[in-house]
Amino acid sequence: MQLYYHKINNLTRYFILIIMIVMIIGITGVARCGKDTFYSILKKFLEEKQLKSQRLAFADDLKNELNSFTKDKFNIDLFKCDGTDKELVRPLMVAYGKCRRSQTEGKYWTSKLDIKVENLLKDNIIPIVTDVRYIEYRDDEYSWLKSRNGILIHLSRKLDDGSIIPPANIEEKANDNKLKAVADFSICWETCQDTNFLYELMQKNLRNIYDRLRLN
């Protein structure tokens, strides 16, 4: 009878492990630090461990709301622009996002992701939010992530001269150091266009993140 109990107990722990490994991951860092690039290599690493993941971003919903305006007024598609055009409309996006957040004490954009996150978790897919930026309100993006047993990865990037890419605006400057201080992982990587090289370079960090997933 005791042996049977131990078998059941071990089986229970096994299923708990399977359930808890499917959690939410957030990536934070200033603009141009490589958050989407890091997501791509993290996704590849998790796939090698037989874990599915999918990118989510608060900014995608923001772009959906603003895109018709920017295309009409500036001939800029927020989902396709880069370089000069992206920097041109960035202040507009920041201001619009801030207005929505101020009206809801930080909950507007997180509420947009709630259903998407739930659907992914039901399918055993790990949601990875690539633009966690705010820790101002009680229920802000960081608190939302943690309320879901999430882990936060802070990313920064070195330039060729050894300096770190600075915040792009006042909003980033006010939040980035705070988010770095509470992040579960803080990673600083080199500027490099070779994602395969970055993948090999980040192996230790990727293993640490994977181990943390298994512990939660």
What are these regions (language model features)?
Residues 35:
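Conserved lysine of the Walker
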Residues 27:
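Hydrophobic anchor at the beta1->P-loop junction of P-loop NTPases
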Residues 112, 140-216:
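Small-molecule kinase domains that catalyze NTP-dependent phosphoryl transfer to phosphate-bearing small molecules
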Residues 38:
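Hydrophobic positions on the alpha1 helix immediately C-terminal to the Walker A/P-loop
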